[in-house]
């Protein structure tokens, strides 16, 4: 009897446009969650938001809010903005100012406060008209870890592992070479094509995930599905992702991780 052949190179099984969502007085792009992408297809990833605006627009916005039960990662694509978080008792906000290219990783665990893009310092320095762009994503924690101690760390761009793969420049946010660890084995990569071209990058078998296109356009997967911003490309099973025909300046985030196989309970800023 002929045995089925396992596919090595992953297909792009779905290409989905991000939708616009109002949040804290702004409009942001929300590629995930999406109605056509059930959580069990992207487990352990819960949410992805892309925000883009000028810091002066933050003047009258209070972004302080609580979280619980997941890893909250905030990647600064452009500009620099202050942020705040509280991981200890009393709710005291600790300030940080991650520069462009930095990653803030907040383990919310049993509960933490967070405030994105506090722009007062930048306005005082005359930087209010600076354009700011970031991606925020939530990654679930196992139910056994949801009451863990909250913690935070900033991965600066100069400490980030950067490597060349094919025609692409790959920055490792999470995965081999990064000090940032999630509750489950995962890889989060910023992949860019300064001059266009192609790349085939490993994605461990058993991981579930997707690509989110930030700039440019390219063809994704063994089945060659074109995608452009702001589209999410859901990946099928396999051991690698092939991306071809990238135009110069193309950039996307690759997010993949080992699923928990648990059904989380979503309750606003909490994931139980």
Predicted regions and their residues:
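Jelly-roll (double-stranded beta-helix
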Residues: 1-272
